[in-house]
């Protein structure tokens, strides 16, 4: 998606050969026009897949997921990372490790919102080693729902996430595929 790549080139900051900072438009400050375009693109790619729910993880996956949900006309569920007084019974949970934050957390979704009748599109801001995606897949599998695929805003293709997910049989659609962050420069695949 050229609009996204242009934004990464102009506003992304390479912090190391493994970390890309995009807080100017995606995971701190949000560019709503770009998010709308991202939602449209995910909807275009998954429109014919019978999606009934979109599942993401808080917090940075919420904006692109909501825009895709708006375009597809389906609800969005975000897995919570933090305990809540209102979210405590009948939970589907998984443990995930955050590459960026270097911390493990338990994510949770209420069984009220996800069932075996659902066909799910997973959306997330980044795909690196695939830990968050695998956690969401675990939760969706616990519910007995089916997975149409994964929509990723930015994929770090030099890490193993995509390969592992595809080898497990999942469809991965990434809007920007980063081949390298070497020498402080973003290099894209395609």
Swiss-Prot record:
Residues the record lists as binding xanthine: 20, 27, 156
S-S pairs: none
InterPro entries referenced in this protein's UniProt entry, alphabetically: PRibTrfase_dom (IPR000836), PRTase-like (IPR029057), Pur/Pyrimidine_PRTase (IPR050118), Xanthine_PRibTrfase (IPR010079)
Pfam families the UniProt entry points to: Pribosyltran (PF00156)
Protein name as catalogued: Xanthine phosphoribosyltransferase
EC number(s) reported in the record: 2.4.2.22
GO biological process: purine ribonucleoside salvage; xanthine metabolic process; XMP salvage
Positions with a binding annotation for 5-phospho-alpha-D-ribose 1-diphosphate: 128-132
Native source species: Stutzerimonas stutzeri (strain A1501)
Role according to the record: Converts the preformed base xanthine, a product of nucleic acid breakdown, to xanthosine 5'-monophosphate (XMP), so it can be reused for RNA or DNA synthesis.
Major localization class: cytoplasm
Keyword annotations from UniProtKB, A to Z: Cytoplasm, Glycosyltransferase, Purine salvage, Transferase
Catalytic reaction(s) noted: XMP + diphosphate = xanthine + 5-phospho-alpha-D-ribose 1-diphosphate
Self-association and partners: Homodimer.
Family: Belongs to the purine/pyrimidine phosphoribosyltransferase family. Xpt subfamily.
Transferase is among the record's keywords: yes
Domain of life: Bacteria
Gene Ontology CC terms, in alphabetical order: cytoplasm
GO molecular function: xanthine phosphoribosyltransferase activity
Enzyme class, broadest EC rank: transferase
SUPFAM superfamilies: PRTase-like
Lineage: Bacteria, Pseudomonadati, Pseudomonadota, Gammaproteobacteria, Pseudomonadales
Location within or outside the cell: Cytoplasm
CDD domains: PRTases_typeI
């Amino acid at each position: 998606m050229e609009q996204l790549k242009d934004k990464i080139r102009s506003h992304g900051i390479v912090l190391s050969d493994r970390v890309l900072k995009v807080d100017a438009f995606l995971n701190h400050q949000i560019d709503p026009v770009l998010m709308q375009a991202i939602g449209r693109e995910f909807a275009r790619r998954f429109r014919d897949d019978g999606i009934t729910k979109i599942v993401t993880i808080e917090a940075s996956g919420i904006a692109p997921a909501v825009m895709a949900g708006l375009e597809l006309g389906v609800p969005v569920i975000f897995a919570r990372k933090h305990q809540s007084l209102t979210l405590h019974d009948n939970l589907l949970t998984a443990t995930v490790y955050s590459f960026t934050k270097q911390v493990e957390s338990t994510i949770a979704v209420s069984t009220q919102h996800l069932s075996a009748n659902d066909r799910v599109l997973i959306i997330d801001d980044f795909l690196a080693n695939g830990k968050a995606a695998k956690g969401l897949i675990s939760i969706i599998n616990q519910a007995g729902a089916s997975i149409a695929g994964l929509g990723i805003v930015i994929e770090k293709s030099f890490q193993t996430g995509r390969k592992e997910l595809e080898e497990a049989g999942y469809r991965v659609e990434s809007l920007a595929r980063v081949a390298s962050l070497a020498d402080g420069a973003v290099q894209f695949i395609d």
